[in-house]
């Protein structure tokens, strides 16, 4: 019988509503053949807020599972033996805390924690650049990344303490060269800091524990070459910069989720083929094959996938690994001159970008530069789709077709339980009432001391977890110790002429502004905890290029703060971007704040919004609703001009 290589880990990124509901989902997925867990946490957990915090309103359990305390984590992994599991936790700013809770639960299960296997993402650099779930400034955040790494070296030697995460960089518009360079710059920043925390003889092994989490887009030949370039460049950095001699410690180890940015709301059944093609990029080449793969569901552009949708993506992996003969062969592309040329070109471009970052002082000093580059690259990507230079089937070519039977009936998505947030808050209140308050206070005081003294925060975090502290209490101590960070928006003040078709819009903006007696003022806001800022940035940048007076202050603002800003700026139109599924409660609150403030201007909303919700929003007073199918930004700009022309002129 032909010898086959072992397949990669099959993961499904999952978590929603409550710890109990997510536990049931995990156990079901494991029974279906999933070989590892990939935990999605909700936004309050990711950003260090308890479920009853004002900023958490409407966000609890929406994009992942809420974890407020040890009881939640205990429930999440009920009847799942952690010593036997390989668990990936997509968590960053609160990674030390979630790992502390995980360790505490494993110890309760009787596990030998030195045998625990898994990963915390723990990459704060990409949070500043794209994802937005940061808490503290870059320097103390870097310190906590390496605190986790130094702790796992001693106590969890099989644990990956960090995923250098280029996934979200591509989602934010990075070119392959930028994705390579920005991710490698992050890896360098982490290893430079980690080298000061571990004995020299143990440093090579720690380098070997750093893993990567990457993206794979539809241009799958280029993406495969990108992965081969990653392998070569990481080996080069480990050997030349850090003097790592053992080849096994220089190995580029990575997991992947294929691209979600390219999944379309229009003709969503086509996404199945996109996902399959993108998976080939990270599985075909043995030399650059992923260690773990998780695939999005075909309907992510519509809303929250159902268990069946996730099962379909899992089956895709299983068919490739077990029915095909892919794993019977050595690397299929070694010696291919076209592949080698492309790999070398990508490496040269990445080295040039990396040298520029290094000249600025490294990744932390280059955050503003990298953010601006991503916003520019994403604007160029969107412009290519708008003009048709980049073909997207069902979006800008071949847009007519028969209705899909997949999207009939229940709307093809899972709807969040509206009672889940109230239930979670009730359990949180019961947890607080039943714990030893003095023990919690003492544990938090010790955490504060460790944070301010420079000690590793992991032991104090584990003690706080066992004492009964909450996610919000843990994060509050770090905010007190290090302060809270406001990230760059990447939206430059100067307009750009890179986009076609702007002249008629600029003329319309100038005409309306002349009648108003001042420039058309457009305030863009991101309410709640949703850190996916790409859409808001692109709307703000395009409006700026069209001649509007733009205010965009970035992410994580309350409805009251956004409305106050719009009132202070005398906005003619207010726009909200919400991609977390929390559009209904957040928009309702913004409308109430607008009424209280006497702000009578059009409100427009963009996000992943089902049509029934969009209809309800319009009925409640929202002037326009935009979803991923509305990819033509110039048309949105003309809509805004028309709204202002009809409403604000009459008022003024």
Curated annotation (Swiss-Prot):
Q: Which Pfam families match?
A: B12-binding, MM_CoA_mutase
- According to the UniProt record heading this chain, what is the dependence of activity on pH? Optimum pH is 6.5-8.0.
Q: Which reaction does it catalyse?
A: (2R)-ethylmalonyl-CoA = (2S)-methylsuccinyl-CoA
Q: Which InterPro entries match?
A: Acid_CoA_mut_C (IPR006159), Cbl-dep_enz_cat (IPR016176), Cobalamin-bd (IPR006158), Cobalamin-bd_sf (IPR036724), MeMalonylCoA_mutase_a/b_cat (IPR006099), MMCoA_mutase_a_cat (IPR006098)
Q: What class of enzyme is it?
A: isomerase
* Effects seen without this gene: Cells lacking this gene are able to grow with carbon substrates that do not require the operation of the (complete) ethylmalonyl-CoA pathway (succinate, propionate/HCO3(-), or acetate plus glyoxylate) but are unable to use acetate or acetoacetate as the sole carbon source. They show undetectable ethylmalonyl-CoA mutase activity when grown with acetate plus glyoxylate, while are still able to convert methylmalonyl-CoA to succinyl-CoA.
| Oligomer and partners | Homodimer.
Described purpose of this protein according to its UniProt entry: Radical enzyme that catalyzes the transformation of (2R)-ethylmalonyl-CoA to (2S)-methylsuccinyl-CoA. Is involved in the ethylmalonyl-CoA pathway for acetyl-CoA assimilation required for R.sphaeroides growth on acetate as sole carbon source. Is highly specific for its substrate, ethylmalonyl-CoA, and accepts methylmalonyl-CoA only at 0.2% relative activity.
Protein name per its UniProtKB record: Ethylmalonyl-CoA mutase
What species is this protein from? Cereibacter sphaeroides (strain ATCC 17023 / DSM 158 / JCM 6121 / CCUG 31486 / LMG 2827 / NBRC 12203 / NCIMB 8253 / ATH 2.4.1.)
Q: What lineage is this protein's organism placed in?
A: Bacteria, Pseudomonadati, Pseudomonadota, Alphaproteobacteria, Rhodobacterales
Provide the gene name from the record. Answer: ecm
């Amino acid at each position: 019988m032909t010898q086959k290589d072992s397949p990669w880990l099959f993961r499904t990124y999952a978590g929603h509503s409550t710890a109990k509901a997510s536990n049931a989902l995990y156990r079901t997925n494991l029974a279906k053949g999933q070989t590892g867990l990939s935990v999605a946490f909700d936004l309050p957990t990711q950003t260090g807020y308890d479920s009853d915090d004002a900023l958490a309103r409407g966000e609890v359990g929406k994009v992942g599972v809420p974890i407020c305390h040890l009881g939640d984590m205990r429930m999440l992994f009920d009847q799942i033996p952690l010593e036997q599991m390989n668990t990936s936790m997509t968590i960053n700013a609160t990674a030390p805390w979630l790992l502390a809770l995980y360790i505490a639960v494993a110890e309760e299960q009787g596990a030998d924690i030195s045998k625990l296997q898994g990963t915390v993402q723990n990459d704060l650099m990409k949070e500043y650049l794209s994802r937005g779930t940061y808490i503290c400034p870059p320097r103390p955040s870097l310190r906590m990344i390496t605190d986790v790494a130094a702790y796992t070296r001693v106590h969890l030697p099989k644990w990956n303490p960090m995923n250098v995460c280029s996934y979200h960089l591509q989602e934010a518009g990075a070119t392959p060269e930028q994705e390579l360079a920005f991710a490698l710059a992050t890896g360098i920043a982490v290893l430079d800091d980690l080298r000061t925390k571990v004995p020299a003889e143990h440093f090579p092994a720690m380098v070997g524990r750093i893993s990567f989490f990457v993206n794979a887009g539809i241009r799958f030949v280029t993406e495969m070459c990108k992965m081969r370039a990653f392998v070569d460049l990481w080996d080069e950095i480990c050997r030349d910069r850090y003097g790592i001699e053992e080849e096994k410690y220089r190995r580029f180890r990575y997991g992947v989720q294929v691209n979600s940015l390219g999944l379309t709301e229009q003709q969503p059944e086509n996404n199945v083929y996109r996902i399959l093609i993108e998976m080939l990029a990270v599985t075909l080449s043995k030399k650059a094959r992923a260690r773990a793969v998780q695939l999005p569901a075909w309907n992510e552009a519509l809303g929250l996938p159902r268990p069946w949708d996730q099962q379909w993506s899992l089956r895709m992996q299983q068919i490739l690994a077990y029915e095909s003969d892919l794993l019977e062969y050595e690397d299929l592309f070694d010696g291919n001159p076209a592949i080698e040329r492309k790999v070398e070109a990508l490496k040269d471009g990445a080295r040039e970008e990396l040298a520029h970052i290094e000249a600025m002082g490294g990744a932390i000093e280059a955050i503003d530069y990298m953010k601006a580059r991503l916003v520019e690259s994403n604007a160029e990507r969107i412009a290519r789709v708008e003009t048709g230079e980049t073909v997207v089937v069902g979006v800008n070519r071949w847009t007519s077709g028969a209705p899909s039977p997949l999207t009939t009936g229940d709307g093809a998505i899972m709807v969040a339980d509206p009672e889940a947030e109230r239930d979670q808050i009730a359990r949180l209140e019961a947890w607080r009432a039943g714990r030893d308050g003095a023990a919690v206070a003492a544990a938090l005081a010790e955490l504060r001391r460790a944070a301010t003294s420079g000690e590793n925060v992991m032991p104090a975090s584990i003690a706080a977890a066992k004492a009964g502290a909450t996610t919000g209490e843990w994060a509050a101590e770090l905010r007190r110790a290090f302060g809270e960070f406001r990230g760059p928006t990447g939206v430059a003040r100067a307009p750009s002429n890179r986009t076609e078709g702007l002249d008629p819009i600029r003329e319309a903006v100038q005409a309306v502004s002349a009648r108003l007696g001042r420039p058309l003022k457009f305030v863009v806001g991101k309410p709640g905890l949703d850190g996916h800022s790409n859409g808001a940035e692109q709307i703000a940048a395009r409006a700026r290029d069209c001649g509007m007076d733009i205010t965009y202050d970035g992410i994580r603002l309350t409805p009251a703060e956004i409305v106050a800003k719009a009132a202070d700026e005398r906005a003619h139109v207010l726009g909200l971007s919400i991609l977390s599924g929390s559009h209904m409660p957040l928009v309702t609150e913004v409308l109430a704040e607008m009424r209280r403030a006497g702000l009578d201007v059009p409100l427009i909303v963009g996000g992943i919004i089902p049509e029934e919700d969009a209809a309800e929003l319009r009925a409640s007073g929202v002037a326009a609703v935009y979803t991923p199918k509305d990819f033509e930004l110039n048309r949105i700009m003309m809509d805004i001009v028309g709204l202002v022309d009809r409403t604000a002129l009459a008022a003024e």
